[in-house]
Amino acid sequence: MEHTDVVIAPVLTEKSNALRQQGKYVFRVAARATKIQIKQAVTQLFGVTVRRCTVMNVFGKKRRVRHRTGRTSGWKKAIVHVAAGQSIGVLERA
């Protein structure tokens, strides 16, 4: 798996903005990506030292359109803890 295939997009929410000030960055990642692959991808793409990586599965929600019910797709989220004094500049400006 290529590094650009592992990290799909940053998650930009109020909670992720609060975590960013603590040196933690939230990313949407590939469903089959492991912690080691995520750590290597973030290091290669952004040039930072990753101390820790927390991964969780976000389950899809039930949605209803008129009389039909369905589900949204689930996805995988990673919270990456960056070494003290380092930051991902691209996300700081977002």
Swiss-Prot record:
One of its GO terms (molecular function) is structural constituent of ribosome. InterPro entries: Nucleotide-bd_a/b_plait_sf (IPR012677), Ribosomal_uL23-like (IPR013025), Ribosomal_uL23/eL15/eS24_sf (IPR012678). GO terms for biological process: translation. The keyword RNA-binding applies. The keyword Signal does not apply. Keywords: Ribonucleoprotein, Ribosomal protein, RNA-binding, rRNA-binding. GO terms for cellular component: ribonucleoprotein complex; ribosome. Gene3D superfamilies: 3.30.70.330. It comes from the Bacteria. Belongs to the universal ribosomal protein uL23 family. HAMAP family: Ribosomal_uL23_B. Part of the 50S ribosomal subunit. Contacts protein L29, and trigger factor when it is bound to the ribosome. One of the early assembly proteins it binds 23S rRNA. One of the proteins that surrounds the polypeptide exit tunnel on the outside of the ribosome. Forms the main docking site for trigger factor binding to the ribosome. This is Large ribosomal subunit protein uL23. It comes from Treponema pallidum (strain Nichols). The lineage of its organism: Bacteria, Pseudomonadati, Spirochaetota, Spirochaetia, Spirochaetales. The gene is rplW.
